[in-house]
Amino acid sequence: MIIDTLSIIGITVAVVMAVLSLWCSPFRRKLRVATAGSPAAPQPLSLILMTHGNTQALSDCLPLWLNQEYAADLQIIVVVDEGDHQAEDIIKRLSGSHRLYSTFVPQSSRYMSRRKLAVTLGVKAARHDWVLLADADCRPASLQCLTAIMTHCQPETVNQTMVPMYYDEASRGFYQFERLHRALYYIGRALRGRAYSTNAHCLVFRKHQFMDGQGFLGSLHLLWGEYATLVNKYAAPHATAIALDEEARLTQRKPTTAEWRKDQVRALDTNRHLGHGGLYHAVYRLDQTALYLAYLLQIATSVYGALTQRWVMMGVAIAMLLLTVVVRVLWIRRTIHTLNIPMKLWATPFYELRITGHNALTWLRHRLTDKTEFTSHKL
């Protein structure tokens, strides 16, 4: 048994990297599900649903929104494309509800994002200051979903509320994990400073701030990322709430591989145009670097210890490697248990290691994509 200076250095490296890796985990911070302070009373609300041609999702989810048990006045506005007769038929079939209204996006809009035009038309049609914007395929978990979300909307201190979203149980595990992993960084920035972005297709904000800020001015040419640009432009320091309650839960159907990859590339392009993202990117890159560096050095130390018969160094390095894996998995388990997200726990260490490779492939796909896919400026 050899315990020399080199062994002490190897042991120190293994221990320090274990501590650094565990510190640099987005799952380390315990999520606060409960509303801070007294829950806000339900405010009059305008819910804007954007169809984007997804009539099947509208048919499935619109009745769930119309049947919401909401104590205050609720206006539901469905924004459809002009000439979308299937969506119009669905709205006519459900038009008996006094909550339901509709507007349309004209076909003549060519020089700006139709998605952002749809948002703008919906907000202008809203009669209440609090607006909840969502895609038509957002499925509420319960009849109290809107009530649960709006309890976080304190009028004096909150100007927007982010609602993290998850895929349904049929989704691939890595899709679910990647969405949660990215969302934790967005949630962290929102709770500890100023919100940077979101990967959910749902957001609560104030109509008067949207109108005073001239809507999407500055990003009208970007075809995608309406939720991310809204969060980035209108977030104020320490004024973004997060609705993590079980009853506030929203889910989306499982995307196809092609759809998921396109969403990832579009999100990457959108984030290139967002402001105040320095700290977000620094923390994200530090966490990824610490994860890989810890595993690499711990494995290298244990192998070197075995080859040179420094058994203590090898044993400590292996112990630190196992400790790193086990603690990270336990933190992931705590998070997915808190949020009640279906996921195979045994696969999560492999999902974590896959993140950087996935990001690299997304970057490559973005580089190979025609940039006119992201902007309405075709010059």
Task: Give the positions of each predicted feature.
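Membrane-embedded multi-pass helical conduit in multi-pass membrane proteins
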Residues: 4, 289-371
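Cell-envelope/extracellular polymer assembly enzymes that use nucleotide-activated donors
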Residues: 43-46, 75
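Short beta-strand-to-loop acidic/aromatic patch adjacent to the donor-nucleotide binding site
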Residues: 128-139
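Catalytic donor/gating beta->alpha subdomain of glycosyltransferases that bind UDP-sugars
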Residues: 158-182, 211, 217-282
